[in-house]
């Protein structure tokens, strides 16, 4: 017995919980508070260091001045004891050391002038002068020329009291500064983020009520530009919904007419087959069946056109090398079966594209059907493809039909648009829209002109610019009547711009020449 061991799938990881986060207003306010607190702390340290250095420097200057005054007066040599006693007062202590003879001291009650290693080095003559802080006293020791040493100290308690008060003042002022910065930051943040709040409310309103009204724009700063971008998005969404609603409405209208006619014919057929019902003449039965089949075919074509036009299957379409000569030949075979009274003048240069073969075939077939439908019986339809440059060729499909009025040229590629003269002709108004979509998806361009400008009738010519590369001739002849002048004019024609990539061409609205845009709705 064979057992199949299926690999165990790792357990699914539980979704991460949404962690609470501070609002943008609080984050901006905390950032402002942090910056102010940092500046306050740095300034407090700087002020404290400067004032502390100034106070200690002042004490050193006082001790230095008193020592110089005693030395310059000569009282230390005349009466050292009295001079030392006169020097010591308040918070100052003094000492005169004469090695081998005597030591004179004058100290305040409760204070003792400390003698450490620096002072001993001065007394022994190893150092000329020393200054240091010992405990709560600042000590100055000076070695005199006669071998004696003068030591003077001053209490630092008054200075420490001042520094303590300074620390409290800096702490209070810094705290008040941070608090003021927090309040001011909150007010500024609230005022600065008011447009963001309006934008947020508008987005929530759209999500809640589907209200696509634009948001008022104030100023010209970054938030104003953000609001304008949001308004553009709202307008695009409104236009998309409008197009969607119009598509549904138009599709329903276009489907209603053949469905109504089909239903009427089917009901008539069913009624004629009821027992006891009068039989329809055979000729009428044949015509009725033909009408039903024609209406079913019309419905199938309309539904297929709608599916091709509305679906976005860019990720499912297989792109492959496509020989446009074969595409044109197959399309011509299908059109000739429907309109065998039309003469097609074909002059095609072998050309290869990389794209969707089915989509390109549908676009070419729609162009040929369009030209054949509007050509009079026995008329001629021209189908030419010529190379413009190493990477672009131009397909031209021309007829000698009635043409299109200039005021309708901007509308012929819209879905379901049909001109007044086209309403009496069969069709759904989707053929040219499909052509436009396919051409743009393949990085091509469209332009439409009169076949015979000023003629009666003027006819219509569709010019399709297609990217690709030439193929060596294989059973197809190159255009014989094309001169070098024609090639130069085609290469420099300003109405034939070179298409960019597919994405850019798909989004461009100006791919159809405005001045020369003419076609008829099918």
Curated annotation (Swiss-Prot):
Q: Give a Gene Ontology cellular component term annotated to this protein.
A: plasma membrane
Known Pfam families for this protein? HAMP, HATPase_c, HisKA
Q: Which cofactor does it need?
A: Mg(2+); Mn(2+)
User: What keyword terms does UniProt attach to this protein?
Assistant: ATP-binding, Cell membrane, Hydrolase, Kinase, Magnesium, Manganese, Membrane, Nucleotide-binding, Phosphoprotein, Protein phosphatase, Stress response, Transferase, Transmembrane, Transmembrane helix, Two-component regulatory system, Virulence
The residues that cross the membrane are 31-51, 168-188
Q: What is its EC number?
A: 2.7.13.3, 3.1.3.-
| HAMP domain residues | 190-242
Known catalysed reaction(s)?
ATP + protein L-histidine = ADP + protein N-phospho-L-histidine
Which ranges does the record list as Cytoplasmic topological domains? Answer: 1-30, 189-522
For membrane topology, the record states:
Multi-pass membrane protein
Provide the GO MF annotations for this entry: ATP binding; phosphoprotein phosphatase activity; phosphorelay sensor kinase activity
The ranges of region (Disordered) come to 468-522
Membrane topology (Extracellular)? 52-167
Q: Which residues form a coiled coil?
A: none
Keyword Cell membrane carried by entry: yes
Q: Where is the Histidine kinase domain?
A: 250-470
Check the record and name the CDD domains matching this protein.
HAMP (cd06225), HATPase (cd00075), HisKA (cd00082)
Carrying Phosphohistidine, the residues are 253
User: Is Transmembrane one of the keywords UniProt gives this record?
Assistant: yes
Name this polypeptide is given: Signal transduction histidine-protein kinase/phosphatase MprB
According to its UniProt entry, this protein's organism is Mycobacterium avium (strain 104)
Which gene underlies this protein? mprB
């Amino acid at each position: 017995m064979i057992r199949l061991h299926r690999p165990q799938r790792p357990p699914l990881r539980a979704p991460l919980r949404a962690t609470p986060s501070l609002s943008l207003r609080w984050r901006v306010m905390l950032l402002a508070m942090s910056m102010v607190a940092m500046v306050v702390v740095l300034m407090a340290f700087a002020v404290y260091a400067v004032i502390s250095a100034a106070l200690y420097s002042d004490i050193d200057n006082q001790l230095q001045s008193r020592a110089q005054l005693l030395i310059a007066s000569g009282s230390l040599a005349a009466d050292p004891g009295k001079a030392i006693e006169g020097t010591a007062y308040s918070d100052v202590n003094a000492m005169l050391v004469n090695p081998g003879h005597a030591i004179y001291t004058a100290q305040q009650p409760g204070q003792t002038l400390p003698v450490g290693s620096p002072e001993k080095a001065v007394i022994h003559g190893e150092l000329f002068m020393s200054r240091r802080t010992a405990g709560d006293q600042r000590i100055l020791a000076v070695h005199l020329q006669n071998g004696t040493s003068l030591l003077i100290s001053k209490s630092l308690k008054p200075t420490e009291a001042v520094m303590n008060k300074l620390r409290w003042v800096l702490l209070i002022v810094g705290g008040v500064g941070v608090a003021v910065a927090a309040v001011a930051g909150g007010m500024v943040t609230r005022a600065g983020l008011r447009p963001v709040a309006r934008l947020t409310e508008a987005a929530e309103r759209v999500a809640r009520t589907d209200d696509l009204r634009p948001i008022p724009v104030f100023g010209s700063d970054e938030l104003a530009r953000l609001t304008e971008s949001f308004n553009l998005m709202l307008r695009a969404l409104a236009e998309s919904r409008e197009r969607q609603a119009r598509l549904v409405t138009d599709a329903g209208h276009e489907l209603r007419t053949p469905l109504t006619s089909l239903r009427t014919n089917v009901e008539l057929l069913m009624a004629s087959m009821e027992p006891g019902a009068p039989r329809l003449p055979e000729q009428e039965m044949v015509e009725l069946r033909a009408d039903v089949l024609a209406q079913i075919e019309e419905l199938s074509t309309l539904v297929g056109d709608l599916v091709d036009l509305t679906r976005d299957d860019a990720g499912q379409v297989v792109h492959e090398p496509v020989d446009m000569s074969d595409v044109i030949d197959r399309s011509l075979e299908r059109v000739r079966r429907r309109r065998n009274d039309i003469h097609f003048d074909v002059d095609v240069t072998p050309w290869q594209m990389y794209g969707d073969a089915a989509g390109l075939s549908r676009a070419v077939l729609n162009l040929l059907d369009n030209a054949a439908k509007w050509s009079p019986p026995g008329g001629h339809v021209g189908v030419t493809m010529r190379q413009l440059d190493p990477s672009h060729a131009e397909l031209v499909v021309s007829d000698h039909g009635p043409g299109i009025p200039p005021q309708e040229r901007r509308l012929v590629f819209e879905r379901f648009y049909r001109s007044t003269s086209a309403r009496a002709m069969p069709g759904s108004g989707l053929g040219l829209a499909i052509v436009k979509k396919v051409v743009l998806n393949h990085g091509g361009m469209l332009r439409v002109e009169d076949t015979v400008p000023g003629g009666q009738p003027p006819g219509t010519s569709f010019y399709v610019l297609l990217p690709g590369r030439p193929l060596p001739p294989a059973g197809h002849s190159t255009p014989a009547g094309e001169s070098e002048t024609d090639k130069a004019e085609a290469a420099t024609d300003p109405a034939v711009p070179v298409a960019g990539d597919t994405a850019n061409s798909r989004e461009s609205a100006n791919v159809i020449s405005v001045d020369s845009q003419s076609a008829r709705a099918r």
